[in-house]
Amino acid sequence: MNGKYYYGTGRRKSSVARVFLIKGTGQIIVNGRPVDEFFARETSRMVVRQPLVLTENAESFDIKVNVVGGGETGQSGAIRHGITRALIDFDAALKPALSQAGFVTRDAREVERKKPGLRKARRAKQFSKR
């Protein structure tokens, strides 16, 4: 990557995304593959593009993303968070609009741990009265 770039780290569930914005044509590369090839679900692709569409920068930047951990939903959310932070690095005036949409806030929800004596985090064994 030559020249000026803008960087943002995004996190969601157990996924971490490192996002680099470079002036360009709107190409999004995730782990060396185009975003449409990387994500099978259309909703995941939409989530990734949300901050760009909101700020009308969809065709202004080429985006290079490195994402590790988690599944499709977590990774797309982490990329969205990273793109949002990189856009704020590019222009701080975009922050109020991105905040209003809820993209700046890190979604702190994580998987609840399994407890001993239960089948899952909250699911108990079936109780039989007789």
Swiss-Prot record:
Gene Ontology MF terms in the entry: RNA binding; structural constituent of ribosome
NCBIfam families the UniProt entry points to: PRK00132.1
Listed GO CC annotations: cytosolic small ribosomal subunit
Organism taxonomic ancestry: Bacteria, Pseudomonadati, Pseudomonadota, Betaproteobacteria, Neisseriales
PROSITE patterns: RIBOSOMAL_S9 (PS00360)
Protein name: Small ribosomal subunit protein uS9
Domain of life: Bacteria
InterPro entries according to UniProt: Ribosomal_Su5_D2-typ_SF, Ribosomal_uS9, Ribosomal_uS9_bac/plastid, Ribosomal_uS9_CS, Ribsml_uS5_D2-typ_fold_subgr
Sequence similarity: Belongs to the universal ribosomal protein uS9 family.
GO biological process terms on file: translation
Keywords in alphabetical order: Ribonucleoprotein, Ribosomal protein
